[in-house]
Amino acid sequence: MKSIFNLSKGILSVALISVAFASCSEDTMDNINKDKDHTTSVPAKFILADVITATAFSNIGGDFNTYYSTYVEHMVGVDNQLANAEKRNGEPSASSTFNNVWGNLYSTLKNARIAINISSNEVTGNYTTKGIGEVLAAINAGLIADSFGDTPFSQAALPELANGQPQFLTPELDKQEAIYTAIMEYLDAAITDLPKGDKSDEIGEYDFIYKGDGEAWLKLAYGLKARYTMRLLARSSSKDADLQKILEYVDKSYTSIEEQAAFSIYSATNLNPLFDFQWSRDGLAASKSYADKLIERNDPRLRRIFCIGQGKLTENENAVSIQVTGADDPRFLMADNGTAESVKYEYNTPIFVYS
């Protein structure tokens, strides 16, 4: 009997030890694939460097530029998907047309909101950095509202997660009007925060537009206030008062082109996305309807804003520098809106793509 009891004790001990080892092994396995070198939090200035780049390169400089320029007849699409867009052949209504920029906008807005939250710590007091985040949030929210109308906003691109997942997997649509209200709130907050400065960890060189100059960002904020007040004039209950506000905002904004919010870090190897697209594909041609308006009004810009197509140049000419001299120029060749042939390097090129 005693031997049976001892045997039972032995079996129980082995079982307990096995369970303990299994538990330890499970804990070890749970932690073995955790990347301990991957940071879980970063200063807001690093996040805003990405937000500024994404806003300029992907959101403002991306698909909106190319597609919208054909829809409003500033340019004519003559190649591939832009030729389809020009002829309204699937591209305007296809759900995939703006997939890339849609994802980029919401990702950028979320990152701007994260930077705002990080900078809101009263101990660190990074008010200028917070104000920059608020201006960038307003810009991206404006692109969303202008482009998509009623769309997810208050329940989308939120900085806080719920159990590692977005708080709202099927966010509700916000009215476009509500998004414009939020834009103004962001700008008002920025106007309050920007002049206060940063107590620590200034954004400095990570601000690729103004190098952390709060006064410059303040002028941008007032310029955006003027823009969106103008955009809402048709719905204004007091147009005269809003027109006066616009003048006041403009007075507090830029006084020269040198102050504009320019993302000027492009180079021969890091190309402006619109220029890169045109240079590699020649998918956009000069618009006949646009040129006709300039001719009708005897607008002198006709001699400044169109370049000769690359296929029409001589060996000694440079595509970027040879401008059309007017409607009587023998190489004046505009693309017909909606019916242009899908050919490259023939039509005149709008100078805007070389900016």
Spans of model-derived segments:
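Sec-dependent bacterial lipoprotein signal peptides
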Residues: 1-22
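Membrane-proximal, proline-rich intrinsically disordered regions
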Residues: 24-81, 92, 96, 103-106, ...
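Aromatic-residue-lined binding/catalytic grooves and analogous aromatic/hydrophobic interfacial grooves
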Residues: 25-26, 150, 184-197, 214, ...
